[in-house]
């Protein structure tokens, strides 16, 4: 049986970057959809309780599954940036952390406080091979975008990067899911992915921030849709509405503040048998 763990795909190359979304200006782009809760009064962790999923080719694994539709799962994302804004130290660059939660502990729905992942991952490292991968993955935002250009860290970018990492982490369509719901407390992410993106393209972007990540995200959404898996976004107004948001936010903050090896280049994280 294949060993479980987190592995890095080769860093992105400029020549392999996604098609620029300006190519869509003559066609109608189909953005992601908004998730409408089946029961609006339920907290996300009640609407998507942790359930054990069985599959013929691997051990049972936990996922946050919609109690009203067993073909839908929840992924929770967040990001944090330190040393930015007017109160930041102008002598030091901003440092951002990203995090996403894709499963929990069967006894408590959430793992104990997660430790940030340290780059680089090495499958030959004995500590790596013996690690127990928790359900929340946290990491430092890279210093380059998917097109290879240097970027400045911001909290918006960190959260957007977390969405991409979460959607790329597992082949969700191959697991059999027909909808992946992204839970976040940032309207910029939800409105951008579901409403604003076609407008930005129509207006020629006009120096819109994080264009590289928005193009990367839309490409992933279209790929999953082509495999019969829809991506939807669910906005909660603050972390107190959901334990999921609070725990994922804490992991992102920890990643931003923890000293460690940073990745320069934009890198895909792959969860194997998790």
Regions found by a protein language model. Give the residues of each.
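RNase H catalytic domain
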Residues: 5-11, 163-249
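RNase H-like nuclease fold core
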Residues: 6, 10-12, 16-157, 169-172, ...
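Charged, low-complexity intrinsically disordered terminal regions and linker tails
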Residues: 32, 58-66, 222-227, 231, ...
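Aromatic- and glycine-enriched pocket-lining scaffold segments that form the walls
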Residues: 97-99, 247, 251
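Loop-to-helix element that buttresses phosphate recognition and phosphoryl-transfer chemistry
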Residues: 158, 162
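Acidic, His- and aromatic-enriched active-site or binding-groove loops in soluble protein domains
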Residues: 207-213, 253-274
């Amino acid at each position: 049986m294949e060993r479980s763990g987190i592995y890095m795909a080769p860093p992105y190359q400029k020549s392999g970057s996604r098609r620029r979304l300006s190519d869509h200006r003559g066609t109608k782009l189909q953005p992601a959809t908004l998730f409408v809760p089946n029961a609006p009064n339920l907290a996300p962790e009640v609407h998507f309780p942790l359930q054990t999923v069985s599959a013929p080719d691997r051990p049972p694994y936990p996922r946050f599954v919609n109690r009203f539709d067993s073909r839908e799962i929840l992924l929770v994302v967040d990001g944090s940036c330190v040393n930015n804004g007017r109160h930041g130290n102008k002598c030091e660059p901003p440092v951002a952390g990203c995090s996403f939660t894709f499963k929990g502990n069967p006894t408590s729905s959430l793992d104990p406080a997660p430790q940030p992942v340290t780059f680089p991952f090495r499958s030959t490292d004995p500590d790596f091979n013996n690690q127990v991968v928790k359900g929340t993955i946290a990491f430092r935002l890279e210093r380059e975008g998917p097109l290879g250009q240097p970027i400045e860290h911001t909290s918006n970018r960190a959260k957007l990067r977390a969405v991409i990492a979460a959607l790329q982490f597992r082949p969700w369509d191959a697991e059999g899911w027909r909808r992946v719901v992204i839970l976040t407390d940032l309207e910029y992410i939800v409105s951008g992915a579901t409403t604003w993106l076609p407008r930005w393209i129509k207006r020629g972007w006009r120096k819109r921030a994080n264009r590289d990540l928005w193009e990367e995200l839309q490409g992933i959404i279209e790929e999953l849709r082509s495999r019969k898996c829809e991506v939807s976004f669910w906005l909660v107004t603050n972390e107190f509405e959901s334990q999921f948001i609070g725990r994922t936010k804490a992991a992102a903050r920890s990643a931003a503040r923890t000293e460690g090896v940073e990745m320069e280049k934009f890198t895909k994280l792959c969860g194997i048998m998790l």
